[in-house]
Amino acid sequence: MFKSKLYFQLKKLKRSFLIWKTLFLLLIGLWFDNFIFKFFLKSSAQKIHLQEKRARWFTKELIQLGSAFIKIGQLLSARPDLIPKTWIKELTTLQDAVPPFSFTKVTQIIREELNSNYENINQLDSVPIGSASLAQVHKATLENGKEVVFKVQRPDLKTLFKIDLDIMQQIAFVLQKNKNWSRGRNWVAIAKECRKVLMKELDFNCEAQYAARFRQQFLDDENILIPEVIWDMSTERVLCLTYLKGIKISNIKDLKDQNYNLTKIAEVGAISYLKQLINYGFFHADPHPGNLAISNEGKLIFYDFGMMGNITNNLQKRIGSMVKSAALRDASSLVAQLQEAGLISEGIDVGPIRRLVRLMLKEALTPPFSPNIIDKLSGDLYELVYETPFQLPVDLIFVMRALSTYEGVGRMLDPSFNLVSITKPYLISIMSSNNQSPNDL
């Protein structure tokens, strides 16, 4: 017992040194960048270049620090109120692919978690089909002949997360004490929320529930496939799903060789997102190309349900009115709707928000539509949120990021893809169901 406690404390001390060293180097780097810009550089383009360079360095450091900080970086990419737009752009590219751990450990963890149910596995592939910061995925065949995949959590991950998140709390306390660094943000509360989210992500029972709920939403959709959870083979550290074979959506050559209709596939994904956001209020928050594939039948497959988002009932009920206000380009009405839905806190000066919304509506609704309109609007929103002392709900940021990410996927499939023009017929049907004139669109 004494040795294990000593080992834990020594490990925590070593991690603490590495993490604080990284923070110190970051602060020195930011001070140096500000000094260079203030006295030697004149243009905003040069400042942006410096920010991008520092953001790339920070992203690499997060990867070096390991699983917990990779996940922290991904969470920061959804917080435009905390970091500038140039940093968000870099952090959204943060990949958490890491070398796989040994197959011996994989079988050991599955045995420990499944107990006697382990005997239901007929064959378990030794080579993973995917390896990330939290887990790796192995294909398997059960005794009943069903093909499945096992998502297996990395060894000792909870212990490592506890150490790193404890240190992150200390850092948040220091930032909170310094007015120049805190920028009016409650870093201690942010660190606590971050801890809550990450520890929840380590519980694969939560992901199993998310996957089951998401699958239920699309059971009757002939264009969408979602893997089924194998409940008696899933635990806190092991998630078992049916294996859905498909061609990764980024493999355009193979998709074309199979004569798939890429334009239709892009539209199917776009409409699925409208259904997720408007009909169900529960959406896949990370639709990057690695999480999407096309089945042999040409159906869109979603993978990985660790990062999902919710839309409140209050917001869902107001979507029809918001669409009406947006269609009429009535920025004041739309901002009022956002306030009533609880998306903008009371007491906030809505003047800057109203001006930005007016510009966003003009850009979004005036033909010809920009092919990357969501990405452009997200950038405008992020700049406003960073510069003003208010915080948009994280799930709303996840919505913008998910739509922006899928917009990129759509353009990859079809260069003429435009999210606004595709969704217009769907929005017209919503307005009609809310007794509003679709002619306004």
Task: Label every model-predicted segment.
Residues 1-136, 159-187, 195, 410, ...:
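N-terminal accessory/targeting segments that precede structured cores
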Residues 6, 46, 52, 235, ...:
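Helix-rich C-lobe and terminal helical cap/extension of kinase-like folds
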Residues 85, 92-99, 111, 158-163, ...:
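ATP-dependent phospho-/nucleotidyl transfer catalytic cores
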Residues 128-132, 230-234, 397:
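A short beta-turn/loop motif at secondary-structure boundaries
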Residues 134, 146, 236-237:
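Residues on conserved beta-strands of the protein kinase catalytic domain
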Residues 139, 146-153:
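Glycine-rich ATP phosphate-binding loop
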Residues 140-141, 287:
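Conserved beta3 strand of the Hanks-type protein kinase catalytic N-lobe
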Residues 290-294:
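Hydrophobic residue at the +6 position relative to the catalytic HRD Asp in the kinase catalytic loop
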